[in-house]
């Protein structure tokens, strides 16, 4: 697929999203448009798989042509359902396919003028035949119900709960709501997501594009579900350094799941994806995102809970861990955690008002011996004292897990302008006697009000990390002894000197210039005085 075609698809989807924009704010209509796209994806995958089964069985008709009201049709449906639940994790009947519902919702729009006269109606939408709200709600419920008692039940549970089709935000009356939904379905139905071409991830890329667009319009709320793509790329490349395959990848604050999926793009294969997310709506988005990117329901395990207070994967150790936790979030810091294996060995807990190092401790606990992890933190985590200073010292002096500190530009995250950094940890370090410091804070491109890392900026960070090189005013490999001398303060300017000397001023030359200007001024004053005398007017000086 050409880049132009890809951009055209993305613009088409964003235009459809804007059909709902006037009715509600960005994060609300996000849930609807992404939900409808997801429903279309499920339906088309179902149809492709069912048609394949029919073809392999020697049948010449399509899944959508099966008559559900006949005994023979029911036999076909039951047989396909059994295989679909195993392969796809869910099932849709022919009448529940996206294209079928869209056609019903836009029945009169597609009919001829004579058809409309015969039906004795002058409305384009909202006749009895094309009222689809109730049917659509039942179908979304049926998708979930089809998984009950199967291995995929948890992955589909309440997946569409944020799509309230009876919300007055969609329209004041059922007829108005039906009209807007029918329009959205009709527009989506015209778009070819090319799902039959398994080499292309057209829809996955478009979904990520939309998530990013919604994040840019969501302000502070964006941080709940989205890490800018270029930052995700840096994190993903850091934790996959030297790896072609991963047994597992984990994100303890996974948001929409985009960061996990970005890691998968950097290697040939990821066996299993794990994540945890506090926000219920974002948790639903993460599961949709996984399924829509073709991650099989048996290979991802996303949980909804508070990661620090109620961790859901304590028995697991992961080969790669990435995270962009909420900056300096509050947590309970309950003293009972001093007997929790994640925190007990450090002797101190992160303060209740700043959970940054609590997330780091949690991640280190889950890191496999051959694993790598990268986490985004606010700059304060590099130098704040008290308990945080103690934990920082323990991680470096006792554990020697810290591999690199990377300073990022300010204002690259939606909703906050604070400068951030990436800490990279490894349990088995190839360079156990030093820590790499990179100052990439000045390397960015300005896009409207936001700063962004360009492809070149990303490549420079990653290559500097992988080559572990010192570059004037950009990076420095600091011996552990130097870090100890700085009392384990990791503030980057202590290690990377970015000071630019001002050009020396030639005082004698400046004095000569002033004298010359003064002489010129006197000559000009004489000239003006002579003009004033000729004009018989008073001189201005």
Where on the chain are the PLM-derived regions?
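Non-catalytic, mostly N-terminal accessory regions of nucleic-acid modification and defense proteins
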Residues: 1-234, 238-239, 298-307, 407-411, ...
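Alpha-helix initiation/capping motif
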Residues: 2, 174-177, 195-199, 224, ...
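A conserved structural/catalytic subdomain of Rossmann-like adenosyl-cofactor enzymes
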Residues: 4, 70, 311, 315-541
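Conserved, well-folded catalytic cores of nucleic-acid-processing
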Residues: 19, 187, 191, 209, ...
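Short small-residue beta-strand/loop micro-motif enriched in glycine and branched aliphatics
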Residues: 215-218, 269-272, 445-446
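Conserved S-adenosyl-L-methionine
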Residues: 221-323, 328-346, 357-358, 378-380, ...
């Amino acid at each position: 697929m050409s880049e132009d075609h890809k951009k055209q698809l993305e613009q088409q989807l964003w235009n459809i999203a804007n059909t709902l924009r006037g009715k509600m704010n960005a994060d609300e209509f996000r849930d609807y448009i992404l939900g409808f796209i997801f429903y279309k994806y499920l339906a088309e995958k179902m149809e492709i798989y069912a048609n394949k089964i029919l073809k392999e069985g020697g049948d010449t008709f399509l899944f959508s042509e099966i008559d559900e009201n006949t005994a023979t049709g029911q036999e076909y449906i039951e047989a396909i359902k059994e295989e679909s639940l195993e392969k796809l994790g869910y099932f849709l009947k022919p009448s529940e396919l996206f294209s079928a519902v869209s056609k019903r919702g836009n029945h009169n729009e597609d009919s001829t003028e004579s058809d409309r006269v015969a039906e004795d109606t002058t409305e384009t939408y909202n006749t009895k035949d094309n009222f689809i709200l109730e049917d659509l709600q039942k179908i979304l419920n049926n998708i979930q119900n089809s998984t009950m008692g199967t291995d995929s039940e948890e992955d589909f549970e309440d997946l569409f709960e944020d799509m309230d089709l009876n919300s007055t935000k969609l329209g004041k009356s059922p007829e108005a709501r039906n009209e807007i939904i029918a329009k959205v379905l009709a527009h989506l139905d015209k778009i070819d997501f090319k799902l039959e071409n398994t080499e292309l991830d057209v829809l996955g890329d478009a979904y990520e594009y939309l998530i990013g667009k919604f994040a840019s319009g969501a302000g502070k709320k964006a941080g709940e579900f989205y890490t800018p793509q270029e930052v995700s790329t840096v994190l993903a490349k850091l934790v996959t350094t030297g790896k072609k395959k991963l047994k597992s990848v984990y994100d303890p604050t996974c948001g929409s799941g985009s960061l996990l999926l970005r890691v998968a793009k950097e290697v040939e294969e990821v066996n299993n994806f794990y994540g945890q997310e506090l926000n219920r709506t974002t948790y639903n988005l993460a599961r949709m995102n996984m399924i829509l990117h073709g991650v099989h329901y048996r290979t991802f395990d996303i949980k909804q809970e508070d990661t620090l207070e109620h961790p859901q994967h304590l028995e697991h150790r992961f080969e790669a861990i990435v995270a962009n936790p909420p900056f300096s979030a509050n947590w309970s810091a309950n003293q009972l955690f001093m007997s929790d294996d994640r925190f007990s060995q450090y002797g101190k807990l992160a303060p209740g008002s700043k959970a940054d190092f609590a997330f780091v401790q949690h991640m280190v606990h889950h890191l496999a011996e051959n694993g790598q992890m990268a986490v985004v933190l606010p700059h304060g985590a590099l130098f704040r004292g008290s308990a945080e200073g103690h934990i920082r010292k323990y991680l470096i002096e006792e554990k020697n897990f810290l591999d690199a500190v990377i300073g990022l530009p300010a204002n690259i995250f939606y909703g906050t302008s604070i400068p951030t950094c990436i800490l990279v940890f490894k349990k088995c370090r190839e360079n156990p006697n030093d820590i790499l410091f990179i100052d990439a804070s000045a390397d960015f491109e300005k896009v409207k009000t936001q700063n962004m890392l360009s492809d070149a900026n990303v490549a420079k960070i990653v290559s500097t990390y992988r080559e572990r090189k010192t570059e004037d005013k950009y990076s420095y490999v600091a011996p552990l002894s130097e870090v100890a001398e700085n009392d384990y303060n990791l503030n980057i300017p202590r290690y990377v000197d970015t000071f630019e000397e001002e050009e020396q001023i030639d005082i004698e030359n400046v004095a000569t210039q002033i004298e010359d200007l003064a002489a010129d001024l006197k000559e000009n004053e004489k000239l003006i005085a002579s003009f004033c005398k000729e004009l018989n007017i008073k001189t201005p000086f």
